[in-house]
Amino acid sequence: MSVTVYVSATLRGFVNRNAKLLAEGNTIKDVLCSQTKKSDIIPDGYIEYETEPREYRLNSISTIINVNTAIEDVYSSPYDQVKEQLELAIESLREHQESQLINNDDYGLLKNVPDSQRIQTRNGAPTPDDLDELITKVWKEPSFFLAHPRAIAAFERECTKRGVPPVTTNIAGGTFITWRGIPIIPTNKLLVDGLKEPKSQSGKTNILLIRTGEAKRGVVGLYQAGMKNEQSRGLSVRFRGIDDKGVASYLLSLYCSAAILSDDAIAVLEDVEVGEYYDYE
Protein backbone atom coordinates (compact mmCIF):
# COMPACT_ATOMS: atom_id res chain seq x y z
CA MET A 1 0.00 0.00 0.00
CA SER A 2 1.38 3.39 -0.93
CA VAL A 3 0.67 6.10 1.59
CA THR A 4 1.33 9.71 0.74
CA VAL A 5 1.30 12.69 3.03
CA TYR A 6 0.81 15.97 1.19
CA VAL A 7 2.37 18.98 2.84
CA SER A 8 -0.38 21.56 2.77
CA ALA A 9 -2.71 23.46 5.02
CA THR A 10 -5.47 20.96 4.31
CA LEU A 11 -3.81 18.42 6.62
CA ARG A 12 -4.23 20.53 9.76
CA GLY A 13 -0.91 22.11 8.97
CA PHE A 14 0.61 18.86 10.25
CA VAL A 15 3.65 19.04 8.03
CA ASN A 16 3.06 22.47 6.60
CA ARG A 17 6.05 23.42 4.53
CA ASN A 18 4.43 26.48 2.95
CA ALA A 19 7.21 28.44 4.58
CA LYS A 20 7.50 32.15 4.00
CA LEU A 21 10.06 32.80 1.27
CA LEU A 22 12.09 35.59 2.80
CA ALA A 23 15.31 37.16 1.66
CA GLU A 24 18.07 36.88 4.23
CA GLY A 25 17.89 39.71 6.74
CA ASN A 26 14.42 40.86 5.72
CA THR A 27 11.36 40.84 7.96
CA ILE A 28 8.18 38.95 7.13
CA LYS A 29 6.24 42.05 6.19
CA ASP A 30 6.62 45.80 6.47
CA VAL A 31 4.61 47.12 9.41
CA LEU A 32 3.61 50.53 10.71
CA CYS A 33 4.77 51.57 14.17
CA SER A 34 3.94 55.18 14.88
CA GLN A 35 2.66 57.38 17.71
CA THR A 36 1.93 60.36 15.51
CA LYS A 37 -1.63 61.40 14.86
CA LYS A 38 -1.15 62.03 11.17
CA SER A 39 -2.70 59.60 8.73
CA ASP A 40 0.18 57.32 7.82
CA ILE A 41 -0.37 54.75 5.10
CA ILE A 42 -0.43 51.24 6.55
CA PRO A 43 1.70 48.85 4.48
CA ASP A 44 -0.19 46.02 2.82
CA GLY A 45 0.66 42.99 0.76
CA TYR A 46 0.67 39.20 0.70
CA ILE A 47 2.87 36.62 2.37
CA GLU A 48 4.74 34.55 -0.19
CA TYR A 49 4.46 30.78 0.05
CA GLU A 50 5.47 27.68 -1.85
CA THR A 51 2.94 26.86 -4.56
CA GLU A 52 4.23 23.28 -4.80
CA PRO A 53 5.27 22.28 -1.26
CA ARG A 54 7.36 19.21 -0.64
CA GLU A 55 5.52 15.88 -0.66
CA TYR A 56 6.37 13.39 2.07
CA ARG A 57 5.89 9.68 1.46
CA LEU A 58 5.68 7.39 4.45
CA ASN A 59 8.45 4.81 4.50
CA SER A 60 7.31 1.20 4.93
CA ILE A 61 9.27 -1.07 7.28
CA SER A 62 7.94 -4.64 7.33
CA THR A 63 8.83 -8.14 8.47
CA ILE A 64 7.13 -11.54 8.78
CA ILE A 65 7.35 -13.57 12.00
CA ASN A 66 6.69 -17.32 11.98
CA VAL A 67 5.75 -19.15 15.17
CA ASN A 68 5.27 -22.92 15.37
CA THR A 69 1.87 -23.58 16.93
CA ALA A 70 3.43 -26.38 19.00
CA ILE A 71 5.57 -23.75 20.73
CA GLU A 72 2.47 -21.70 21.43
CA ASP A 73 0.57 -24.73 22.74
CA VAL A 74 3.26 -26.19 25.00
CA TYR A 75 5.40 -23.26 26.18
CA SER A 76 2.95 -20.39 26.63
CA SER A 77 2.99 -20.58 30.42
CA PRO A 78 4.00 -18.52 32.29
CA TYR A 79 4.73 -16.33 29.24
CA ASP A 80 2.70 -16.01 26.07
CA GLN A 81 5.23 -17.12 23.45
CA VAL A 82 3.49 -15.40 20.53
CA LYS A 83 3.27 -12.12 22.42
CA GLU A 84 6.91 -12.31 23.50
CA GLN A 85 8.18 -13.04 20.00
CA LEU A 86 6.06 -10.30 18.48
CA GLU A 87 7.37 -7.81 21.04
CA LEU A 88 10.95 -8.71 20.12
CA ALA A 89 10.14 -8.22 16.43
CA ILE A 90 8.44 -4.89 17.13
CA GLU A 91 11.49 -3.72 19.08
CA SER A 92 13.64 -4.58 16.06
CA LEU A 93 11.31 -2.57 13.80
CA ARG A 94 11.49 0.40 16.17
CA GLU A 95 15.29 0.26 16.13
CA HIS A 96 15.25 0.31 12.34
CA GLN A 97 12.74 3.17 12.40
CA GLU A 98 15.06 5.21 14.62
CA SER A 99 17.95 4.60 12.25
CA GLN A 100 15.87 5.67 9.25
CA LEU A 101 14.64 8.84 10.96
CA ILE A 102 18.25 9.92 11.39
CA ASN A 103 20.02 8.50 8.32
CA ASN A 104 17.45 7.99 5.54
CA ASP A 105 18.61 9.56 2.27
CA ASP A 106 15.17 11.13 1.69
CA TYR A 107 13.70 12.27 5.00
CA GLY A 108 16.54 11.55 7.47
CA LEU A 109 17.36 14.39 9.84
CA LEU A 110 21.06 14.46 8.95
CA LYS A 111 20.28 14.81 5.24
CA ASN A 112 17.78 17.63 5.77
CA VAL A 113 19.67 19.99 8.07
CA PRO A 114 19.91 23.33 6.21
CA ASP A 115 23.43 24.43 5.27
CA SER A 116 23.05 27.50 7.49
CA GLN A 117 22.50 25.18 10.48
CA ARG A 118 25.69 23.13 10.02
CA ILE A 119 28.80 23.96 12.03
CA GLN A 120 32.21 22.37 12.48
CA THR A 121 34.00 21.61 15.73
CA ARG A 122 36.71 24.06 16.78
CA ASN A 123 39.43 21.46 17.35
CA GLY A 124 37.85 18.08 16.62
CA ALA A 125 36.69 16.97 20.07
CA PRO A 126 33.23 18.19 21.17
CA THR A 127 33.87 21.02 23.63
CA PRO A 128 31.44 23.09 25.72
CA ASP A 129 32.15 25.96 23.29
CA ASP A 130 31.01 23.78 20.38
CA LEU A 131 27.71 22.92 22.05
CA ASP A 132 27.21 26.59 22.92
CA GLU A 133 27.62 27.41 19.23
CA LEU A 134 25.07 24.73 18.42
CA ILE A 135 22.60 26.33 20.83
CA THR A 136 22.93 29.64 18.96
CA LYS A 137 21.45 27.84 15.95
CA VAL A 138 18.44 26.38 17.81
CA TRP A 139 17.94 28.94 20.55
CA LYS A 140 14.13 28.96 20.51
CA GLU A 141 13.08 26.29 23.02
CA PRO A 142 15.55 23.53 22.09
CA SER A 143 14.34 20.09 23.22
CA PHE A 144 17.44 17.89 23.35
CA PHE A 145 20.80 16.98 21.87
CA LEU A 146 21.24 13.64 20.10
CA ALA A 147 24.68 12.04 20.16
CA HIS A 148 26.44 8.68 19.97
CA PRO A 149 27.48 7.39 23.42
CA ARG A 150 31.13 7.73 22.34
CA ALA A 151 30.52 11.40 21.48
CA ILE A 152 28.88 11.96 24.88
CA ALA A 153 31.89 10.38 26.59
CA ALA A 154 34.21 12.62 24.56
CA PHE A 155 32.20 15.69 25.58
CA GLU A 156 32.35 14.67 29.25
CA ARG A 157 36.14 14.35 29.00
CA GLU A 158 36.35 17.88 27.60
CA CYS A 159 34.15 19.13 30.46
CA THR A 160 36.34 17.35 33.02
CA LYS A 161 39.46 18.88 31.45
CA ARG A 162 37.94 22.35 31.89
CA GLY A 163 36.56 21.69 35.36
CA VAL A 164 32.93 22.15 34.32
CA PRO A 165 31.23 18.76 34.81
CA PRO A 166 27.76 18.70 33.20
CA VAL A 167 24.65 18.51 35.37
CA THR A 168 22.47 15.38 35.21
CA THR A 169 18.70 15.15 34.96
CA ASN A 170 16.10 12.39 35.25
CA ILE A 171 13.84 11.68 32.28
CA ALA A 172 11.33 8.81 32.35
CA GLY A 173 13.33 7.04 35.03
CA GLY A 174 16.67 7.39 33.23
CA THR A 175 19.61 9.64 34.09
CA PHE A 176 21.03 11.87 31.35
CA ILE A 177 23.68 14.56 31.36
CA THR A 178 22.67 18.06 30.27
CA TRP A 179 24.35 21.12 28.88
CA ARG A 180 22.84 24.54 29.58
CA GLY A 181 19.80 22.68 30.88
CA ILE A 182 19.29 20.75 27.62
CA PRO A 183 19.43 16.94 27.96
CA ILE A 184 21.89 14.97 25.81
CA ILE A 185 20.15 11.80 24.61
CA PRO A 186 22.36 8.88 23.50
CA THR A 187 21.73 6.98 20.27
CA ASN A 188 24.03 4.67 18.35
CA LYS A 189 22.16 5.57 15.15
CA LEU A 190 24.39 8.64 14.82
CA LEU A 191 27.20 6.53 13.44
CA VAL A 192 30.91 6.81 14.20
CA ASP A 193 32.82 6.40 10.92
CA GLY A 194 29.70 4.71 9.54
CA LEU A 195 29.45 2.18 12.38
CA LYS A 196 27.14 1.79 15.36
CA GLU A 197 29.89 0.13 17.37
CA PRO A 198 33.28 1.33 16.08
CA LYS A 199 36.24 -0.97 16.65
CA SER A 200 38.94 1.67 17.14
CA GLN A 201 39.13 4.33 19.83
CA SER A 202 39.15 7.17 17.31
CA GLY A 203 36.49 8.15 14.81
CA LYS A 204 34.19 10.95 13.71
CA THR A 205 30.46 11.44 14.19
CA ASN A 206 27.83 14.19 14.41
CA ILE A 207 25.81 15.76 17.22
CA LEU A 208 22.27 17.03 16.60
CA LEU A 209 20.31 19.68 18.48
CA ILE A 210 16.56 19.48 17.91
CA ARG A 211 13.40 21.37 18.76
CA THR A 212 10.38 19.06 18.57
CA GLY A 213 6.65 19.59 18.22
CA GLU A 214 4.21 20.91 15.66
CA ALA A 215 3.10 23.80 17.87
CA LYS A 216 6.73 24.99 18.13
CA ARG A 217 7.34 24.52 14.39
CA GLY A 218 9.95 21.95 15.24
CA VAL A 219 10.75 18.43 14.08
CA VAL A 220 7.73 16.11 13.88
CA GLY A 221 7.34 12.41 13.19
CA LEU A 222 4.85 11.31 10.54
CA TYR A 223 2.78 8.15 10.67
CA GLN A 224 -0.45 6.69 9.29
CA ALA A 225 -3.21 6.77 11.90
CA GLY A 226 -6.26 4.52 12.02
CA MET A 227 -4.81 1.46 10.27
CA LYS A 228 -6.46 -1.93 10.55
CA ASN A 229 -4.94 -4.11 13.27
CA GLU A 230 -3.09 -1.09 14.64
CA GLN A 231 -0.96 -1.91 17.69
CA SER A 232 0.57 1.53 18.21
CA ARG A 233 1.21 4.68 16.18
CA GLY A 234 1.96 3.67 12.61
CA LEU A 235 2.36 -0.03 13.49
CA SER A 236 0.03 -2.85 12.46
CA VAL A 237 0.21 -6.60 13.18
CA ARG A 238 -1.76 -8.93 10.88
CA PHE A 239 -2.30 -12.66 11.33
CA ARG A 240 -1.59 -14.34 7.96
CA GLY A 241 -2.83 -17.81 8.83
CA ILE A 242 -1.39 -21.28 9.60
CA ASP A 243 0.28 -23.43 6.96
CA ASP A 244 0.15 -27.23 6.52
CA LYS A 245 3.09 -27.67 8.89
CA GLY A 246 1.35 -25.88 11.75
CA VAL A 247 3.39 -22.68 11.49
CA ALA A 248 1.50 -19.47 12.26
CA SER A 249 2.57 -16.35 10.38
CA TYR A 250 2.29 -12.67 11.33
CA LEU A 251 2.96 -9.61 9.17
CA LEU A 252 4.35 -6.57 10.99
CA SER A 253 4.23 -3.25 9.14
CA LEU A 254 5.47 0.13 10.31
CA TYR A 255 4.97 3.38 8.37
CA CYS A 256 7.04 6.41 9.28
CA SER A 257 8.72 9.58 8.12
CA ALA A 258 9.79 12.93 9.59
CA ALA A 259 9.54 16.60 8.71
CA ILE A 260 11.45 19.70 9.80
CA LEU A 261 8.85 22.47 9.98
CA SER A 262 11.30 25.39 10.10
CA ASP A 263 15.00 25.78 9.39
CA ASP A 264 15.90 26.77 12.95
CA ALA A 265 14.34 23.60 14.42
CA ILE A 266 17.54 21.59 13.95
CA ALA A 267 21.30 22.04 13.79
CA VAL A 268 24.25 19.69 13.53
CA LEU A 269 27.81 19.74 14.84
CA GLU A 270 29.86 17.89 12.23
CA ASP A 271 33.19 16.04 12.26
CA VAL A 272 33.11 15.35 15.99
CA GLU A 273 36.23 13.43 17.03
CA VAL A 274 35.56 10.84 19.75
CA GLY A 275 39.12 9.63 20.34
CA GLU A 276 40.69 12.45 22.37
CA TYR A 277 41.92 11.25 25.79
CA TYR A 278 43.84 12.98 28.56
CA ASP A 279 46.10 12.02 31.46
CA TYR A 280 45.14 13.55 34.79
CA GLU A 281 47.58 13.93 37.66
Where in this protein do the model-derived segments appear?
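Sequence/fold signature of self-assembling virion shell proteins
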Residues: 167-281
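Extended, solvent-exposed, turn-rich assembly/linker loops in the middle of proteins
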Residues: 113-177
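N-terminal "assembly arms/tails" that initiate or stabilize quaternary assembly
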Residues: 1-51
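Alpha-helical scaffold segments that mediate packing/assembly in large oligomeric complexes
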Residues: 62-141
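Short, surface-exposed beta-edge/turn micro-motifs
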Residues: 105, 140-143, 205, 247
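Residues at beta-strand starts and edge strands
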Residues: 59-63, 141, 244-248
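Intrinsically disordered, low-complexity linker/loop segments enriched in Gly/Pro
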Residues: 40-69
